[in-house]
Amino acid sequence: MTLPGEQHLHKIQFYATTAYSCGYLADKPAQSLIATPHHLIDAHAYSGLIQLGFRRSGKFAYRPHCETCHACIPVRLPVAEFQPSRSQRRAWKQHRNLSVALIELAFSEEHFALYSAYQAARHEGSSEDPETVEQYRNFLVQSNVESLMVEFRENGVLKMVSVVDIVRDGISAVYTFYDTADKHASYGTYNILWLLDWCGSLNLPYLYLGYWIKESRKMAYKQNFLPQEGLIDGEWRPIHTERYAQPK
């Protein structure tokens, strides 16, 4: 199977996975379209794929390919047009004391400990087993594209790690994990604001945030960053006119 689009993708083939349980919408099956062979998915090829709605997990580039559901919408932020809300400006001011370091992808016990604590807090009460070091490595440490880890520290203490990909027209936020112990912190918001600022300093027009699903509260935070574009029917177009209102 091939996809229409950019010329440099002509050597890449695509196959659909078998159905599996959706991780975001309960009781719904899901399928993905996988780009292959993996060694051809370099920074150049991935820059084309991300514009077609693909994302990266380890060495795999994929996008949703569900027969009866089209809830997953790839979203990106036009950097030059971004308008922070009042709460986002507060988050920016609150965490400006964090020191930031860009490092190559590599396994770190310190990173894995923070990741494990983050997963435990986010999936409290879940019957799923904790992720192993191997699963973590496969997910976040392996990449065939231009990827970096962004470390955020406060007085030398690791508070957050953001894994990102650099593509032709922007930065793609792959995954972020942070210290959940401080209930008054806004690390996730600050991470997106910092990445937007970094995009601007590199003259990159877009920050890619992955998929947004209207019915998923886990993804509702993405709607708070405006203006925003979504890939709908093969075309990037403006979506969301209002920020997410937390249900009372």
Curated annotation (Swiss-Prot):
Q: Where is the signal peptide?
A: none
Q: Which GO terms describe its biological process?
A: ubiquitin-dependent protein catabolic process via the N-end rule pathway
Please tell me one Gene Ontology term that the record gives under cellular component: cytoplasm
Q: Which GO terms describe its molecular function?
A: arginyl-tRNA--protein transferase activity; leucyl-tRNA--protein transferase activity
Q: Where in the cell is it found?
A: Cytoplasm
Q: Does the keyword Acyltransferase apply?
A: yes
Which Pfam families does this UniProt record tie to the protein?
A: ATE_C (PF04377), ATE_N (PF04376)
- What are the UniProt keywords, alphabetically? Acyltransferase, Cytoplasm, Transferase
Q: What is its EC number?
A: 2.3.2.29
Q: Which residues cross the membrane?
A: none
Reactions that this protein is recorded to catalyse: N-terminal L-glutamyl-[protein] + L-leucyl-tRNA(Leu) = N-terminal L-leucyl-L-glutamyl-[protein] + tRNA(Leu) + H(+); N-terminal L-aspartyl-[protein] + L-leucyl-tRNA(Leu) = N-terminal L-leucyl-L-aspartyl-[protein] + tRNA(Leu) + H(+)
Major site of localization recorded for this protein: cytoplasm
Query: Which HAMAP family does the entry link to?
Result: Bpt
As for what it does, the entry says: Functions in the N-end rule pathway of protein degradation where it conjugates Leu from its aminoacyl-tRNA to the N-termini of proteins containing an N-terminal aspartate or glutamate.
As for family, the record states: Belongs to the R-transferase family. Bpt subfamily.
Q: What is this protein called?
A: Aspartate/glutamate leucyltransferase
Organism of derivation: Methylobacillus flagellatus (strain ATCC 51484 / DSM 6875 / VKM B-1610 / KT)
Q: What does the organism's lineage look like at the top?
A: Bacteria, Pseudomonadati, Pseudomonadota, Betaproteobacteria, Nitrosomonadales
